[in-house]
């Protein structure tokens, strides 16, 4: 897999995958971006916007009419204005990155004719109305809200539609299965239809009291006969001499037990003797022999049900009603009336049960009105129903599009499940839908059909950002609608404009609330690029309208066969959220209905084509799918005759003939998520450890020097590019200018004359991420380099040459070492600390605000009372710390004084005041100090001033610096623009016939390069040529040039204006200062480290290099791991990685030798030969020139990087071959010597290179100590936790331990003076100050709290102090 990219030529990965990938992996943050773009639709397409997203919300709420229908407010269109601040400015100022929404509304006022009631339009007014700000998504799929980056996580919820289920026999003691159906709309009332233990069918609306389902059908407008004819067939029994003639149908009579002989009605022959059962086969044979009808006696009619009302045609008297059961008595009566034909219901109690007929019989309501009243009473208990109110309420429950919405998805699901064909624009229920649900449910009870599996991904869908936001905005607009209606009715409608009717606060508040406090709007995990990408691809079943942790059972959390290729079976958190929070698989995408789809290659007649089809779980159910690693011949035909497939219908693995296979997986890694796809040899790891491995990669801290893994999977480049950590070129071009903070590229391709030919890429330097890790980008290119579109031009945090690099490759030895690696501890070499291998930079942010208080304004100043000059040495004259100052815990960062309340003065004080004048005692020092445990360097200071407050020196200096930077940007861009435009102009004019030109140009002479360069550039535009086309092009170019120039200047002025304008600060704040401290964290004992295979541990000791075990060539191991950590955990992938990494490093050494040979003999042949042996015939390497080849070899010297994709990677034989190529022992083991004694260890040791990560759990953030500190207000016990500077809890079990030792005095002081005996605490302190060590324990405050609680219950508790008691025993009482 040759990557012909700029970085791909600098370091080539050897690829071990065998399977050719046909499908392109979709962009990894597509889920977020596509969804939100569809919601906003910023640019209005020609012909107007489609009815979706924001447009759909406005369409559904508008038009709004007033109560009397005399006026109407219509929605016309909406548009966005440009955002006030760009993303970076919002981050710095703590603003939300949002664009103002402008909506055009039309107010129509009607005249109403009093006699006819006809409306005529009286007045129409249109106006643009501001409707609040809508947050915009950044390039990387995040939102900036109040200055912090947030991610909206997609939610998995139950798809709208109809679901059939049973109670698994748990409701009733007999264990009978009670079936139920539930119609779930997107919004609106739920409809449940269920059986009870007596097989009567009931309906419930919104989980309220149940009503017989026939009442619901009455309310829908059916009568008893129609209900029966809907659910049952009608059979005509005809009277003949010997009994009744019945048409014979094999399906109906199968399983029929005879009481009397069965007799053919036409021939009179006995078909089946009495007492026998008619089998299915026998029934079919009889039908084939031509049996038309049977003769049944009177007694066999008894127990059947009538299908129609039997009416006397003359008198209109009803003898029997439809659904009535025939008894001997009623049959006798019917015979007497002389009925020759009886229409009966086709109910045999075997294939067709009498459930609906029994429900009809049990139902007390007989008419539509009764049924509507009954439903009204259930929905609104206590209100007396009228026929109109009952009808309106029933209509609005399921048939009103305002109140009920199935959504397109729900309609599609209903159609599929019930085999209906309603269009997906019909979003409410229909009568047919409800009847079809009841029919299907009754069919289930009769044993036809299957119940639904609610964990099937066809029944769960994803709500992404756009949809969640749409629902939220709709809520806001509906709140607004009420206010508008009231206002329209109360004001004089002829004089107002739309603006006066609208208050956009509710809409804006709904959006703000959603982004600020919704459970699905989360603070982005920005530890490293992988954690960002994973966070954006997360699917959560929690959140509003979803599950809760407590209620979610095992089934919901479990892996389901339909997850294959859609949701990762590995990556999910450990703990209470396991299985509720999932990750999207690598190739998965979400379709327009919100179902997760995965790509497959189509197979035709035993041959696999390159056509890629995306299938959802429902569609996949119809096909059989082969795996990606099926053997194919070069033409793409299956080699085997029988192929192992997943059968969609049964969801089992089956063997299928090659020509019957429908689809094949596109890639072996399509079933796992991004994080899991980054683990090499994932297939050799136990699932539990793979889960830990994928979760821990997200916690890896970006290191000072990133290094890509020797053993990768080929996904590293994709993640680095899609996460936005590494910068990719937007257009093909040449590097024009470069420094640490920006890259300027002159575009050479797709030069649109209307666009600037220059791209400027700003790099982020030492920015703080959400998790306080350091974001720093550095360029990979130099001036004059050619880059293509999409090439990586700068590395970000945790990326190396455009590949994700979360950790470092270190030399590992698997052996015990003096017990220091017992139980997953890790032993490190001092080299790792000395060479800064695992050193990371963390940036802490501290802020201080100067507020306006009641006693006067706070002041940021250097003049602080009672502070030595030494403590102020790092502050400038404004009282703010210098950039570059080294600070440690307790140092002042920003000096601040706060006025304090006047306390009454003593006469002595008054005298001193009078003599020495005003003293600075009326202020107290509230400076910002460095908190404990932090030590570092100041890297940035930002000062924010309220509008109208004078800026101090420091703020002005920062502003001047920023303006200089902006001016430099403008000038550079201008210079490149000039060079570009005038270069193109000269090329166009050169060697043309000139008919005009600047002053002094001879007419009708040739324009040569020399002639052009005589004149200043600004006059070049004056040249003219007879070619009209050329002149038009030059004119267009000039127009574009002037516009660009103007645009540049305008942008510069806008930015300067923003800088000089005051900042928007919270109310009461005059000034705010933010200080950023960079902390360098070297690795130390107590830090957590991990590999990629779930092999985690804590550093136990850092050993001098000379004491570490070493190899025969004198190389010392960097890290020693315990071999016992492997067998029981079954993550063998780490061992394979170790061997392969060992081979990579060995091959790197070989390449290093060829570099040395080149410097001696100036011959590159041995190098090319060595690379050919390693890589085979690699196109990229063949295409390199000598200089590029040398650069490649230098990059490969530490180790040759390889890619071993998941489920398709290097096999044992490949690893052995690599080891042999490197000239190493194929066993992967080496003789190792003890660094302390120099002796060899008794056995050979597995040694190799493993990729280790340093995780975000650093001991510096966790270690904590307290002497005195804050106490809880009520109990007076010390607070807990590091954040509160709390103490260590001495809990119940610890008390038991001291009791067990009989350490009474220690225990007493733990429970009193060291905790909540307030008086005792101060006494102890005084005693210590005096150098004394006697103290007395008093009564703990918590005892008083207990007494007060008992008193509050009305129990008076008194302490009686007996004369004999010692003070300690009194406390014990």
Swiss-Prot record:
It is an enzyme of class 2 (transferase). GO terms for biological process: DNA-templated transcription. Gene3D superfamilies: 2.40.50.100, 2.40.50.150, 3.90.1100.10, DNA-directed RNA polymerase, beta subunit, external 1 domain (2.30.150.10), DNA-directed RNA polymerase, subunit 2, domain 6 (2.40.270.10), RNA polymerase alpha subunit dimerisation domain (3.90.1800.10), RNA polymerase Rpb2, domain 2 (3.90.1110.10). The keyword Mitochondrion does not apply. The keyword Transferase applies. PROSITE patterns: RNA_POL_BETA. GO terms for cellular component: DNA-directed RNA polymerase complex. SUPFAM superfamilies: beta and beta-prime subunits of DNA dependent RNA-polymerase. Its EC number is 2.7.7.6. Keywords: DNA-directed RNA polymerase, Nucleotidyltransferase, Transcription, Transferase. It comes from the Bacteria. It catalyses: RNA(n) + a ribonucleoside 5'-triphosphate = RNA(n+1) + diphosphate. One of its GO terms (molecular function) is DNA binding. The RNAP catalytic core consists of 2 alpha, 1 beta, 1 beta' and 1 omega subunit. When a sigma factor is associated with the core the holoenzyme is formed, which can initiate transcription. DNA-dependent RNA polymerase catalyzes the transcription of DNA into RNA using the four ribonucleoside triphosphates as substrates. HAMAP family: RNApol_bact_RpoB (MF_01321). Belongs to the RNA polymerase beta chain family. PANTHER family: DNA-DIRECTED RNA POLYMERASE I SUBUNIT 2. This is DNA-directed RNA polymerase subunit beta.
């Amino acid at each position: 897999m040759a990557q012909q990219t700029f970085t791909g030529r600098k370091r080539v990965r050897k690829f071990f995958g065998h399977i050719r990938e046909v499908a392109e992996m979709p962009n990894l943050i597509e889920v977020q971006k596509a969804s939100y773009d569809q919601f906003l639709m910023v640019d209005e397409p020609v012909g107007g916007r489609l009815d979706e997203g924001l447009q759909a919300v406005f369409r559904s709420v508008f038009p709004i009419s007033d109560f009397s229908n005399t006026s109407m407010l219509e929605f016309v269109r909406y548009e966005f204005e440009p955002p006030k601040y760009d993303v970076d400015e919002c981050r710095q100022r703590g603003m939300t990155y949002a664009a103002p929404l402008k909506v055009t509304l039309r107010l129509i006022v009607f005249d109403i004719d009093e006699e006819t009631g006809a409306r005529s339009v009286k007045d129409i007014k249109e106006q643009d109305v501001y409707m609040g700000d809508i947050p915009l998504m950044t390039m990387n799929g995040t939102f900036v809200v109040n200055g912090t980056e947030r991610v909206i996580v997609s939610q998995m919820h139950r798809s709208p539609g109809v679901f059939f289920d049973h109670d698994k026999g748990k409701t009733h003691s007999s264990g009978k299965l009670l079936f139920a159906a539930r119609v779930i709309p997107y919004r609106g009332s739920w409809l449940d239809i269920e059986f009870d233990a007596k097989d009567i069918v009931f309906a419930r609306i919104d989980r309220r009291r149940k009503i017989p389902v026939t009442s619901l059908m009455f309310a829908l407008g059916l009568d008893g006969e129609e209900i029966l004819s809907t659910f049952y067939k009608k059979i005509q029994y005809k009277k003949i001499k010997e009994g009744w003639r019945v048409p014979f149908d094999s399906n109906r009579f199968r399983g029929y037990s005879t009481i009397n002989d069965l007799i053919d009605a036409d021939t009179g022959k006995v078909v089946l003797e009495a007492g026998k059962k008619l089998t299915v086969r026998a029934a079919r044979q009889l039908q084939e022999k031509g049996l038309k009808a049977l003769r049944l006696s009177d007694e066999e009619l008894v127990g059947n049900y009538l299908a129609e009302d039997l009416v006397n045609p003359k008198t209109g008297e009803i003898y029997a009603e439809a659904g009535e059961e025939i008894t001997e008595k009623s049959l006798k009566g019917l015979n007497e009336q002389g009925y020759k034909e009886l229409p009966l219901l086709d109910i045999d109690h075997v294939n067709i049960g009498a459930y609906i007929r029994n429900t009809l019989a049990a139902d007390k309501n007989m008419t539509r009105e009764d049924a509507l009243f009954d439903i009204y009473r259930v929905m609104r208990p206590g209100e007396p129903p009228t026929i109109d109110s009952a009808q309106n309420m029933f209509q609005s429950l399921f048939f009103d599009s305002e109140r009920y919405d199935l959504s397109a998805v729900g309609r599609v699901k209903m159609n599929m499940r019930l085999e209906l064909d309603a269009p997906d624009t019909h979003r409410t229920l229909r009568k047919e839908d409800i009847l079809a649900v009841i029919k299907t449910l009754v069919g289930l009870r009769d044993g036809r059909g299957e119940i639904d599996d609610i964990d099937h991904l066809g029944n769960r869908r994803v709500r992404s950002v756009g949809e969640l936001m749409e629902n939220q905005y709709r809520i806001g607009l509906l709140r607004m609608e009420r206010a508008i209606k009231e206002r329209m009715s109360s004001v004089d409608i002829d004089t107002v404009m739309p603006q006066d009717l609208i208050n956009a606060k509710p809409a804006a508040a709904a959006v703000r609330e959603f982004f600020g406090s919704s459970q699905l709007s989360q603070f982005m995990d920005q530890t490293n690029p992988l954690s960002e990408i994973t966070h954006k691809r997360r699917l959560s079943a929690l959140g509003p309208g979803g599950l809760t942790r407590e209620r979610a059972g095992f089934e919901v959390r479990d892996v389901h066969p339909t997850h294959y290729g859609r949701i990762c079976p590995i990556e999910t958190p450990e703990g209470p959220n396991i299985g509720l929070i999932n990750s999207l698989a690598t190739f998965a995408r979400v379709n327009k209905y919100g179902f997760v789809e995965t790509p497959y290659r189509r197979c035709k007649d035993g041959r696999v084509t390159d056509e890629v089809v995306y299938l959802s779980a429902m569609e996949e159910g119809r096909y059989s799918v082969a795996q990606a690693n099926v053997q194919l011949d070069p033409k793409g035909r299956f080699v085997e005759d029988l192929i192992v497939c997943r059968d969609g219908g049964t969801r089992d693995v089956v063997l299928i003939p090659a020509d019957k296979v429908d689809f094949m997986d596109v890639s072996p890694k399509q079933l796992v998520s991004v994080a899991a796809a980054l683990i090499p040899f994932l297939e050799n790891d136990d699932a539990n450890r793979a889960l830990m491995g994928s979760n821990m990669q997200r916690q890896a801290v970006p290191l000072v020097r990133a290094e890509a893994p020797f053993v990768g999977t080929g996904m590293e480049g994709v993640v680095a590019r899609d996460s936005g950590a590494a910068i990719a070129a937007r257009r093909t071009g040449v590097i024009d200018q470069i420094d640490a903070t920006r890259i300027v590229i002159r575009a050479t391709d797709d030069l649109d004359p209307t666009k600037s030919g220059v791209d400027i890429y700003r790099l982020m330097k030492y920015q703080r991420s959400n998790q306080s890790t350091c974001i720093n980008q550095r360029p990979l290119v130099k001036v004059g380099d050619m880059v293509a579109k999409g090439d990586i031009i700068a590395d970000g945090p945790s990326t190396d040459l455009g590949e994700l690099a979360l950790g470092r490759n270190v030399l590992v030895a698997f052996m015990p070492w003096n017990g220091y690696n017992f139980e997953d501890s890790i032993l490190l070499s001092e080299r790792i600390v000395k060479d800064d291998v695992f050193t990371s930079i963390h940036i802490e942010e501290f802020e201080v605000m100067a507020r306006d208080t009641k006693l006067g304004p706070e002041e940021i100043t250097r003049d602080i009372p009672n502070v030595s000059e030494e403590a102020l040495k790092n502050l400038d004259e404004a009282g703010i710390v210098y950039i570059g100052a080294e600070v440690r815990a307790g140092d002042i960062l920003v000096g601040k004084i706060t006025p304090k309340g006047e306390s009454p003065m003593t006469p002595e004080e008054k005298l001193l005041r009078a003599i020495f004048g005003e003293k600075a005692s009326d202020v107290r020092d509230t400076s910002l100090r460095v908190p404990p445990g932090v030590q570092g360097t100041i890297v940035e200071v930002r000062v924010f001033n309220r509008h109208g407050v004078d800026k101090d020196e420091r703020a002005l200096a920062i502003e001047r610096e920023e303006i200089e930077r902006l001016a430099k940007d403008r000038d550079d861009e201008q210079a490149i623009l000039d060079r570009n435009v005038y270069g193109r102009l000269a090329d166009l004019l050169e060697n043309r016939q000139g008919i005009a030109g600047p002053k002094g140009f001879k007419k009708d002479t040739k324009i040569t390069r020399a002639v052009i360069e005589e004149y200043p550039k600004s006059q070049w535009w004056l040249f003219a040529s007879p070619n009209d086309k050329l002149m038009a092009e030059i004119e267009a170019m000039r127009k574009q040039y002037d516009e660009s120039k103007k645009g540049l200047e305008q942008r510069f002025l806008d930015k300067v204006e923003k800088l000089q304008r005051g900042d928007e600060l919270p109310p009461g704040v005059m000034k705010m200062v933010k200080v950023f401290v960079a902390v360098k964290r070297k690795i130390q004992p107590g830090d957590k480290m991990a590999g990629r295979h779930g092999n985690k541990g804590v550093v136990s000791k850092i050993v001098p290099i000379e004491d570490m075990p070493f190899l025969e060539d004198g190389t010392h191991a960097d890290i020693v791991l315990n071999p016992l950590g492997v067998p029981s955990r079954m993550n063998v992938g780490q061992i394979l990685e170790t061997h392969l990494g060992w081979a990579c490093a060995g091959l790197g050494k070989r390449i290093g030798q060829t570099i040395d040979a080149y410097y001696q003999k100036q011959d590159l042949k041995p190098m090319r030969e060595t690379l050919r042996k390693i890589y085979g015939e690699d196109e990229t390497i063949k295409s390199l020139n000598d200089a590029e080849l040398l650069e490649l070899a230098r990059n490969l010297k530490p180790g040759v990087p390889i890619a071993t994709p998941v489920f398709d990677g290097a096999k044992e034989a490949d690893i052995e071959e690599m080891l042999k190529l490197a000239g190493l022992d194929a066993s992967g083991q080496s003789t190792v010597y003890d660094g302390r004694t120099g002796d060899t260890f008794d056995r050979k040791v597995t040694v190799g290179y493993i990729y280790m990560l340093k995780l975000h759990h650093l001991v510096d953030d966790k270690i904590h100590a307290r002497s005195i500190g804050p106490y809880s207000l009520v109990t007076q016990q010390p607070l807990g936790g590091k954040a509160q500077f709390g103490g260590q809890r001495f809990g119940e079990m610890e008390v038991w331990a001291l009791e067990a030792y009989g350490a009474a005095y220690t225990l007493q002081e733990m429970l009193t003076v060291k905790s909540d005996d307030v008086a005792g605490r101060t006494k102890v302190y005084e005693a210590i100050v005096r150098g004394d060590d006697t103290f007395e324990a008093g009564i703990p405050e918590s005892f008083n709290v207990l007494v007060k609680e008992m008193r509050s219950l009305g129990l008076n508790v008194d302490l009686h102090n007996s004369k004999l008691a010692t003070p300690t025993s009194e406390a014990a009482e």
